[in-house]
Amino acid sequence: VNNMEIIQGIIEAAKIEQAPLILQVSAGARKYASHIYLMKLVEAAVEDSGLPICLHLDHGEDFEICKACVDGGFTSVMIDGSKHSFEENIELTKRVVDYAHNKGVVVEAELGKLAGVEDAVKVAAADATYTDPDQAVEFVERTGVDSLAIAIGTSHGAYKFKGKPELDFARLEKISNLLPNFPLVLHGASTVIPSFVEECNKYGGQLDGAQGVPEDMLLKAGTFGVCKINIDTDLRLAMTASVRKHL
């Protein structure tokens, strides 16, 4: 989430479905909107909806940003040390986990690298690496992290696949079997809803070839321990389509 309008739209949908929410804030959004404004908007969302709402930092790149969000009232934080070596990622993640757990805040980490661009996270397709199942077990055991974002073929942005959508479900199943009942996370998992793409293009957008993760694949991932699916691109497409249509 970046502003009041996005939060309002999400809340209205959640009220209709009577569904709990995880509202994610990137470091860029936090800088743009200001921490205190975001906190007040989320407090208003809780009061307005009466629903359980979690405020989560997405892709925190260092200990300092995670600490600031923990101290500032976030429910959970993500430390993304995927650009570092395996050992450095463990060291950084454990430092965040130790601090956050002492404050009652849960932590998500990432192992493997997703291609694509999101906020300050930029990874070329050639540099993307899938999560090693055996390393995932060691990583969780040594860090004490609460959930783990894994790489099995999804990517950030609206252009997730050049051809037929494919995810490495064999890899996901192995990770799930090695980490039974452990929460796994898929980033870059928007479906890139065709009607939103068509609406954007109809009113001047240029999203030819945009393609996301089919819903049936997301449902299948849910049977292998994936309990959090990030869909920022779909939210941006919905808002962009509406803004283009009305302006």
Model segments located where?
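Short catalytic/ligand-gating loop segments at beta-alpha or beta-beta junctions
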Residues: 187-191
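C-terminal alpha-helical cap/extension of soluble enzyme domains
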Residues: 202-207, 213-247
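Alpha/beta enzyme core
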Residues: 2-29, 35-52, 60-183, 194-211, ...
